[in-house]
Curated annotation (Swiss-Prot):
Keywords per UniProt: Acetylation, Cytoplasm, Cytoskeleton, GTP-binding, Hydrolase, Magnesium, Metal-binding, Microtubule, Nucleotide-binding
GO BP annotations, alphabetical order: microtubule cytoskeleton organization; mitotic cell cycle
Lineage of the organism: Eukaryota, Viridiplantae, Streptophyta, Embryophyta, Tracheophyta
A cellular component annotation (GO) from this entry: cytoplasm
PROSITE patterns associated with the record: TUBULIN
Reaction catalyzed: GTP + H2O = GDP + phosphate + H(+)
EC assignment: 3.6.5.-
Cofactors that this protein relies on: Mg(2+)
Principal EC category: hydrolase
Recorded GO MF terms: GTP binding; hydrolase activity; metal ion binding; structural constituent of cytoskeleton
Entry protein name: Tubulin alpha-1 chain
Gene designation per UniProt: TUBA1
Pfam families for the chain: Tubulin (PF00091), Tubulin_C (PF03953)
Length: 451
């Protein structure tokens, strides 16, 4: 089997996790208590969904997941929520005191105490796998736990499971909407370790997803639940090929191989189509070509950056539902002719496609319409650098005055770590610049030879 272990860290990670497991259960027909009436092979048969769920002898399906937070309130919601019987109590790990939006608390003082317990639980899950493929890590980098404990766990996972791939689903701070003053510090410090310890990181940003909910679903004031349900559709589409048998299956390691041209250039944009409310879906024909086009729309991107400002290096299209390869090829051919969608000159093909025949499911009473087919796109575009340069700019403004730094130093960090992390990100911005402008110098030189 190709099992994946999901690790949900901090409030954002846990709440996105709730939405994901709710959706997985719906897709596989698993009830809230873990029983699965439709499952014929009791006791861990070789079903495709066993990549995400382990089966007990009693026929109960338990998610291969760990939820970690430094304070109990968010995890208590899982412990008392609809799916409380789904998870093993040992999988829900909560501390007693908060990281207080402070990377240093999450990474050094408070996080240190809980990290061994987390690794112990992860080890138990890993021992239960026959062929562990990798980890899906869910966190946000603006807060204290997601950034601090998140990067600490990633560092330790690299030591313990060096060869296993790690996919990050990371919520980055939005340009306008902010949840804490020290977000820029936490994000820069955390990205420093994401750079080294994740293989692929998919950037999400609340503001971009708010806008999608407002525009496409006509929700005037979206809640986090609305946002998370949309994000969970993306994550479900990515992992569908691991959980169902499909026509063109895509493995977690394949994302890495196809999307990451250089190890550091591994921050991805994601988009999903069709995002459409039930009232509208009734009146629209959503063909493969149409949903493919809308996945490339700048307004569909789940992070606030404009792909028209950069070039694509590679992109991965995951279709699900009533889709045949012929339609996909036609849709991709059309995309390639568009002037607005530019690829770097050193990557002429640039498309990886996957098809899964399982149509997308929706949460009953949710906002999304039930549709016949959907596509999720993960793309590696140089425009992602906008996300980093925005955060770096805010970081510089605060750090020039050393504002709030004493809170971090007081928890045992050194000021040098700030400048080290900031330099690493400056190097990353430069890397993106060079990747986008790979062959321009050469072309200018050649023109002289013609006459």
């Amino acid at each position: 089997m190709r099992e994946c272990i999901s690790i949900h860290i901090g409030q954002a990670g846990i709440q996105v996790g709730n939405a994901c497991w709710e959706l997985y259960c719906l897709e596989h027909g698993i009830q809230a208590d873990g029983q699965m009436p439709g499952d014929k092979t009791i006791g861990g048969g070789d079903d495709a969904f066993n990549t995400f769920f382990s089966e007990t002898g009693a026929g109960k399906h338990v998610p291969r997941a760990v939820f970690v937070d430094l304070e109990p309130t968010v995890i208590d919601e899982v412990r008392t929520g609809t799916y409380r019987q789904l998870f093993h109590p040992e999988q829900l790990i909560s501390g007693k005191e908060d990281a207080a939006n402070n990377f240093a608390r999450g990474h050094y003082t408070i996080g240190k105490e809980i990290v061994d317990l987390c690794l112990d639980r992860i080890r138990k899950l890993a021992d239960n796998c026959t062929g562990l493929q990798g980890f899906l890590v869910f966190n946000a980098v603006g807060g204290g736990t997601g950034s601090g404990l998140g990067s600490l766990l990633l560092e330790r996972l690299s030591v313990d499971y060096g060869k296993k791939s790690k996919l990050g689903f990371t919520v980055y701070p939005s340009p306008q909407v902010s949840t804490s003053v020290v977000e820029p510090y936490n994000s820069v410090l955390s990205t420093h370790s994401l750079l080294e310890h994740t293989d692929v990181a998919i950037l999400l940003d609340n503001e971009a997803i708010y806008d999608i909910c407002r525009r496409s679903l006509d929700i005037e004031r979206p809640t986090y639940t609305n946002l998370n349900r949309l994000v969970s559709q993306v994550i479900s589409s990515l992992t569908a090929s691991l959980r169902f048998d499909g026509a063109l299956n895509v493995d977690v390691n394949e994302f890495q191989t196809n999307l990451v041209p250089y190890p550091r250039i591994h921050f991805m944009l994601s988009s999903y189509a069709p995002v459409i409310s039930a009232e509208k879906a009734y009146h629209e024909q959503l063909s493969v070509a149409e949903i493919t086009n809308s996945a490339f729309e700048p307004s569909s991107m789940m992070a606030k950056c404009d792909p028209r400002h950069g070039k694509y290096m590679a992109c991965c299209l995951m279709y699900r539902g009533d889709v045949v390869p012929k339609d996909v090829n036609a849709a991709v051919a059309t995309i390639k002719t568009k002037r607005t969608i530019q690829f770097v000159d050193w990557c002429p093909t640039g498309f990886k496609c996957g098809i899964n025949y399982q149509p997308p499911s929706v949460v009953p009473g949710g906002d999304l319409a039930k549709v016949q087919r959907a596509v999720c796109m993960i793309s590696n575009s140089t425009s992602v650098v906008e996300v980093f340069s925005r955060i770096d700019h805010k970081f510089d403004l605060m750090y020039a005055k050393r504002a709030f730094v004493h809170w971090y130093v007081g928890e045992g960090m050194e000021e040098g770590e700030f400048s080290e992390a900031r330099e690493d990100l400056a190097a990353l911005e430069k890397d993106y610049e060079e990747v986008g402008a790979e062959f321009d110098e050469g072309e200018d030189g050649d023109e002289g030879d013609e006459y």
